[in-house]
UniProtKB/Swiss-Prot annotation:
[4Fe-4S] cluster 1 binds at C35, C40, C46, S273. Residues 47-262 form the Radical SAM core domain. Its cofactor is [4Fe-4S] cluster. GO terms for molecular function: 4 iron, 4 sulfur cluster binding; lipoate synthase activity; metal ion binding. Pathway: Protein modification; protein lipoylation via endogenous pathway; protein N(6)-(lipoyl)lysine from octanoyl-[acyl-carrier-protein]: step 2/2. GO terms for cellular component: cytoplasm. This is Lipoyl synthase. It catalyses: [[Fe-S] cluster scaffold protein carrying a second [4Fe-4S](2+) cluster] + N(6)-octanoyl-L-lysyl-[protein] + 2 oxidized [2Fe-2S]-[ferredoxin] + 2 S-adenosyl-L-methionine + 4 H(+) = [[Fe-S] cluster scaffold protein] + N(6)-[(R)-dihydrolipoyl]-L-lysyl-[protein] + 4 Fe(3+) + 2 hydrogen sulfide + 2 5'-deoxyadenosine + 2 L-methionine + 2 reduced [2Fe-2S]-[ferredoxin]. It is an enzyme of class 2 (transferase). SUPFAM superfamilies: Radical SAM enzymes. The keyword Isomerase does not apply. Its main location: cytoplasm. It is found in: Cytoplasm.
Length: 283
């Protein structure tokens, strides 16, 4: 039975005044964050704590995933000065851990991998003590693009599977096996580089399917995992098929750790970069 009303544990309030200063800084540096673009429910909490996931390569995606709130249309050319601005923000905010992600840019020959590498290099120069986590697209499975990201030596490299294979029709242009291969290629190129992936729950998946995905992730060397509740950004997006209670998320965390994951964040409001610094502490 599909639940259409949000339960009481999903009533987090967003307080714009709590993160006005952070938004001013980002605006001054002409930077985007996935927190803003995806209307993340954790934005007040994270911005108040001076945590953000920077969105490079613009804020327009070339794919049409039916669950995502990032703008979809023909993207503009990316700004080559973006890595320097991101590095300046990381330095000014004195971040101990930073997450860098992007929309999918199938229009670019390397999918944007080169700009990821340049951003890592710029942050290393400006803030050498900052741990760098990347959340990359699939680069259409291109080995050279993935290798360019790995060669930049981030501390964590993530790629989200998002959902179970049966539901991949909601991920326009994506392929479950290709996404698994991205994580495998990263691990094969540098086994020391910690890999991470995430799933949204409440899309219609079964528990058996969830744990089959976790088995698949462990098989390709994935170390870190995030599990969170899918919340439809609007009525025009893919509808929520069910709400997972907090105690079930807790159960999934314990079971995933027992399976062999090094660190698991699991809860209704967990997103890929939520409490990201905690993953680095487990490395």
């Amino acid at each position: 039975m599909k639940i259409t009303r949000r339960p009481e544990w999903l009533q987090k309030k967003i307080s714009p005044s709590a993160h006005a200063e952070m938004e001013r800084l980002l605006g001054d540096l002409q930077l985007h964050t996935v927190c803003q673009e995806a209307h993340c429910p954790n934005i007040s909490e994270c911005f108040r704590s001076r945590q953000a996931t920077f969105l490079i390569l613009g804020n327009i995606c070339t794919r049409l995933c039916s669950f995502c709130n990032v703008t979809k249309q023909s993207p503009h050319h990316f700004d080559p000065d973006e890595p320097a601005r991101v590095a300046a923000a990381v330095q000014k905010l004195q971040l101990s851990h930073v997450v860098i992600t992007s929309p999918t840019r199938d229009d670019l020959p390397d999918g944007g991998a080169g700009l990821y590498a340049q951003t890592v290099t710029a942050i290393r120069k400006a803030a050498p003590q900052t741990a760098i986590e990347l959340l990359i697209p699939d680069f259409m499975g291109d080995h050279g693009s993935i290798a360019a990201v790995v060669a930049a030596c981030p501390d964590i490299s993530g790629h989200n599977l998002e959902t179970v294979p049966r539901l991949y029709h909601i991920r326009s242009g994506a392929d479950y096996r290709r996404s698994l291969d991205v994580l495998k290629i990263i691990h094969d190129l540098d086994p020391r580089l910690l890999t991470k992936s995430g799933l949204m729950l409440g899309l219609g998946e079964t528990e058996v399917e969830i744990f089959q995905v976790l088995d698949d992730l462990l098989a390709v060397g994935c170390s870190y995992l995030s599990l969170g509740q899918y919340l439809a950004p609007s009525r025009s997006h893919y509808p929520v098929q069910g709400y997972v209670p907090p105690e079930i998320f807790d159960n999934y965390r314990e079971r995933a750790l027992a399976m062999g994951f090094k660190h698991v964040e699991s809860g209704p409001y967990v997103r890929s970069s939520y409490h990201a610094e905690q993953y680095g502490m487990k490395g």
